[in-house]
């Protein structure tokens, strides 16, 4: 599976998460996954909540349109973004 897939207007992201980073950013490819660094620690769902908020802001969608399909408790996640209004340049290049 590739890191980024457009499927029926939704975006599927195969992510590798780096919690407790110095800043929030989309790092780039990490094998077959897209590496995303976030500042939140992986405690009590804080990293997942922060990831959802960060992705919602990056794709200009409400947090309710960001769904973690797989990997709630791990670093490897499959995330669906429903009808993104914006696609960051780092991800747009992977779609082509």
Curated annotation (Swiss-Prot):
Entry-linked InterPro entries: DUF167 (IPR003746), YggU-like_sf (IPR036591)
Pfam families: DUF167
GO CC annotations, alphabetized: cytoplasm
Family: Belongs to the UPF0235 family.
HAMAP family tied to this protein: UPF0235 (MF_00634)
Protein name in UniProt: UPF0235 protein Shewmr7_1261
């Amino acid at each position: 599976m590739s890191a980024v897939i457009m499927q029926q207007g939704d975006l599927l992201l195969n992510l590798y998460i780096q919690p407790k980073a110095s800043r929030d950013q989309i790092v780039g490819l990490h094998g077959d996954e897209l590496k995303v660094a976030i500042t939140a620690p992986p405690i009590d769902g804080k990293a997942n909540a922060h990831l959802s908020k960060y992705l919602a802001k990056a794709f200009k969608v409400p947090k309710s349109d960001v769904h973690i399909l797989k990997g709630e408790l791990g670093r490897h996640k499959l995330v669906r973004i429903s009808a993104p209004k914006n696609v960051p340049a780092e991800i747009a290049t992977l779609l082509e």
